[in-house]
């Protein structure tokens, strides 16, 4: 006897929650899959990555109105020469530092924002 999809859905809908849980467990075992991993993989992975992140990238989004002060701040933070710092600021959005600790990233962001730049930490 072969059931149509609609008949199968109706049969599942008539079951209690505990019966559905048992059905899911039996299907996971039979097919060697995990329904929980498939359903919650993307949100759980994103949350875990956000909690475990130890390295951050500081991105200069915009130089702002006071470009000279931002160039000075970039030079001080990165050790670049004047021309390289100017080119970096003018090419915004651009990565200033990558793979740094959260406190270092936040300190750099604060320093650049005080100079007038718009900064993102990723």
Swiss-Prot record:
Sequence similarity: Belongs to the bacterial ribosomal protein bL12 family.
Organism: Actinobacillus pleuropneumoniae serotype 5b (strain L20)
UniProt GO BP: translation
UniProt cross-references to Pfam families, sorted A to Z: Ribosomal_L12 (PF00542), Ribosomal_L12_N (PF16320)
Keyword Ribosomal protein recorded: yes
Protein's gene: rplL
InterPro entries, per the entry: Ribosomal_bL12 (IPR000206), Ribosomal_bL12_C (IPR013823), Ribosomal_bL12_C/ClpS-like (IPR014719), Ribosomal_bL12_oligo (IPR008932), Ribosomal_bL12_oligo_N_sf (IPR036235)
Descriptive protein name: Large ribosomal subunit protein bL12
GO MF entries: mRNA binding; structural constituent of ribosome
Gene Ontology CC annotations of this record: cytosolic large ribosomal subunit
SUPFAM superfamilies: ClpS-like (SSF54736), Ribosomal protein L7/12, oligomerisation (N-terminal) domain (SSF48300)
Keywords assigned by UniProt, alphabetized: Ribonucleoprotein, Ribosomal protein
Known role: Forms part of the ribosomal stalk which helps the ribosome interact with GTP-bound translation factors. Is thus essential for accurate translation.
Cysteines engaged in disulfide bonds, as pairs: none
Subunit architecture: Homodimer. Part of the ribosomal stalk of the 50S ribosomal subunit. Forms a multimeric L10(L12)X complex, where L10 forms an elongated spine to which 2 to 4 L12 dimers bind in a sequential fashion. Binds GTP-bound translation factors.
Keyword Nucleotide-binding: no
């Amino acid at each position: 006897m072969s059931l149509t999809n609609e008949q199968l859905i109706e049969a599942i809908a008539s079951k209690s929650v505990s019966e559905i849980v048992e059905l899911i467990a039996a299907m996971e075992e039979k097919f060697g899959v995990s329904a929980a991993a498939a359903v919650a993989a993307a949100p759980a992975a994103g949350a875990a990555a956000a909690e475990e992140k130890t390295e951050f990238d500081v991105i200069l989004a915009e130089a702002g109105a006071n470009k000279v002060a931002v160039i000075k701040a970039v030079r001080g933070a990165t050790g670049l020469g004047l021309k390289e710092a100017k080119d970096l600021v003018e090419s915004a959005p651009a990565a200033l530092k990558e793979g740094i600790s959260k406190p270092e990233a936040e300190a750099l962001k604060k320093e650049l924002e005080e100079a007038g730049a718009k900064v993102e930490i990723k």
